[in-house]
Amino acid sequence: MLRALLLSLTLITGLAQANTTQQSPISLDTDQGTLYGSLLVPQSDKPVPVALLIAGSGPTDRNGNNPEGGHNDALKKLAQVLARNGIASLRYDKRGVAASRAATPDEKDLSVERYVADVEGWAKLLRDDPRFDRLILIGHSEGALISSLAAPASQADALVSIAGPAYPVGQVLDMQLAMRLPPPLLAESRHMARCISST
């Protein structure tokens, strides 16, 4: 009996949520191609806050999934929780990833500056939408760094850093490379970093 009640409540809650939120595809045209995302908006008669979700490093898609780190839908789940609490959200595939792959198919053409410009472009799109009254940037890991760089030009009302770097970017890169590179390449990488920092 208890199982049937819990199952019924779960189904009703799911249906209620489906009726109170609307998910739609959204896109942003950039100078290198189109970026694609998902916009989740709670039903409301007045403007609501909107969160722009920025994924971390690597080939992480709009839902927070990375072929190197597994499938967990972390950003999708965050968007759903935000919607249940009256906050809209936009999550997107970064350039070079998933549906946005064609925007920058070659990894060597990716840069922090391009990622920042992308956040600023999405932010403008959201600020210009009358359904939204406040803009929140929520970045995970590298996305937290990108968010902090884009916040001033994006005119963000708030910034949330989830597992953002707490060390200087050079030290973060060194720690990440130390886990992946063989010793000779790591030594060469550290030598190049010292040369760059001394100029």
Q: Each predicted region: which residue ranges?
A:
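Conserved alpha/beta-hydrolase
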Residues: 73-101
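Alpha/beta-hydrolase active-site loop
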Residues: 74, 107-128
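Residue in the alpha/beta-hydrolase core beta-strand immediately N-terminal to the catalytic nucleophile
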Residues: 136, 158-160
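Short glycine-enriched nucleophile-adjacent loop
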Residues: 144-154
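Accessory cap/linker subdomain of secreted extracellular hydrolases
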Residues: 162-199
